[in-house]
Amino acid sequence: MSLNQYIRPVRTKLSHISFIRNISITQSSINTTIKNDESISKTTTIPENIQQAKELAGYRALEIPEFKTLGSAEGTTATATGSSSILSINVPPSVPVYIRRGSLLSIYGIQEISSIDSVRSQLQFPNFWKRLIYGGYVSGYQKLISTTPFSLLISSKSRSSGSGSGSGFEKSFVNLVLDGTTDWAILDKSALQVYTGNSLSITMHKLPKFISKKLSRSLKKDKKSKTNTNKLETGLFSWKKLGYTLLSGRGKVGLVGNGSSSGYGSSIYNINLNQNEEILINKNNLLGITVNGPYDLQNCIVKYEFPIINNANPTNTNTNINIKEPVTIVKPKLIQPTTWNLIVLKLKNFNNGFKKIFQIINKYTLGLKTTSYNYLAGNQDFIKVIGPRNLLLQSNTNKSHRGFYNIIPRNKPQAKVWPTNQTTTKVDESSSFSTPKDYLNYVTIEPGKGAVFKSTLDFSETVESIENKNKNKNK
C-alpha cells in the first residue's frame, strides 16, 4: 500500500471534527442602579431652563490670563460700553493674579481637574512706604496662584476699609492691556483693583507741581502769554495728594472708577487726543492718562483758570494776547541842582514807585478775583491736557458723592409729648392735614348766563334739582 492510501482516510475524519467553545457572560445590575439613583437624586438642570443669566465656564487652554467684564458686549476694551461692576478672570496654570483685599467673590472652574486646595493665597502690601508717604493710604493685595487653571469673580467694591467702598459709591471696571509701548499714570488711589503679569511694574511717584521747560517753551511760542510760563502749575499737586501710580511693562490691569453703566446713567469714558489737541477736564474726574515714563506728566498738563471779563473793555476777553506797545527812549537830561528841580525829581521818583506798587496790587487783586470766581463757580479744579494722549474719565467723583448725600435731609425724630395737668387747646387736624377730595365738574346752560361750570362731590343733588325744575316747567 502506498502512503496516500493511509493519509486519505485520516483527512476525511479530520474534516468532520468541529471545535465548539462555550462562553457565558454575566451582566451585573450596578449600572442600572446607578442610573436610577442619578435620575432620582439629580441636582442639575439643562441650560435652557435658566434664562437671562450669563453662564460662567472655566477655560483650560490658556497661556495668558483673560479679563472680561460681565454684562457688556465689549468687556476687554477700555470704553464706556465695557463698564461693569463684576470682572471675570480666567487664569492659566502657574500665573499669579493680584486682587485687592476684600474684593474676591468666587473661585470656580477647578472641580474637573483637582480640588480647591490647589489654589494658593498670599497677602502682600506693594509699595508700602511710598503709598503711605505720597498718598496717605496702604492697600493690601491677595496673590492667587495654582498649578491648574481656575477662574475668578472680582467685585468692583472692596469689603476692606479705606478702599472707597462706601454705600454711596457706584464703581465700574475698565480693563487695560499694557504691551510695553506706553505707560499709564493712574491718579485715583483706589482705582487699581486687580493686575497680573510677570513683567508688569507698579511704582509710586510724586506729582509734579510745575510744568516742564519743554511745555513752557511751547506755550510761549504758541500763545505768546504775558505771564511767566516757567512758574505755571500743573494743578495736580496738593498736600492731601502727593503721588500717583505708574503702570509700565507688560500685563493686564483691572481699574475701577466712580461710574456705572446702570443706575444713574454714569460710566467710564475713553478720550483720544490728537497732536496739539487740547481739552479742559476737572482733575477729580481724571482716572488715568498715558505717559512716557515717570517724568512725562509735567509735559502735558497745566492748570487752567477761567478768565474774568473786564467790564471796562468787554470786547477784549482774551487775556493771553500780548499787545506790543511802542517804546519811547528818553535820553537823560542834565538839570541844575536847584531846590525846585530836586523837589520835582523826588515827586517823579515817588510817582514811579507809586505806579509800580499799584501795578503789583492790581496784579494780585486780579489773581485773587480770578481764584475767588473759579472757586465760587466750582471751576477751581480744572486742568488743560495737551495731546497726543489717551484719557480715562470717570463720570462721578468721591467729592460729588459726599456732597449729594449731605444734601439729602435726614428724618428728624419727632418730639415726645408728655401728659400734663395743664389745659391744652385742641388743634383742628383737618385744616393742617386735610386729605385731597375728588370733585366732579359739570356744565349747565342757563338763559342769560350761557355755559356755567360747577363742581360737586356727588351728582345726586344736582340730578334732583334738575328733575324738580323739569317738573315745574311741565306743570
Curated annotation (Swiss-Prot):
Residues 1-30 form a transit peptide. GO terms for cellular component: mitochondrial inner membrane. Signal peptide: none annotated. One of its GO terms (biological process) is inner mitochondrial membrane organization. It comes from the Eukaryota. Gene3D superfamilies: Mitochondrial biogenesis AIM24. The keyword Lipoprotein does not apply. Its main location: mitochondrion. It is found in: Mitochondrion. Pfam families: AIM24 (PF01987). Keywords: Mitochondrion, Transit peptide. PANTHER family: ALTERED INHERITANCE OF MITOCHONDRIA PROTEIN 24, MITOCHONDRIAL (PTHR36959:SF2). Belongs to the AIM24 family. This is Altered inheritance of mitochondria protein 24, mitochondrial.
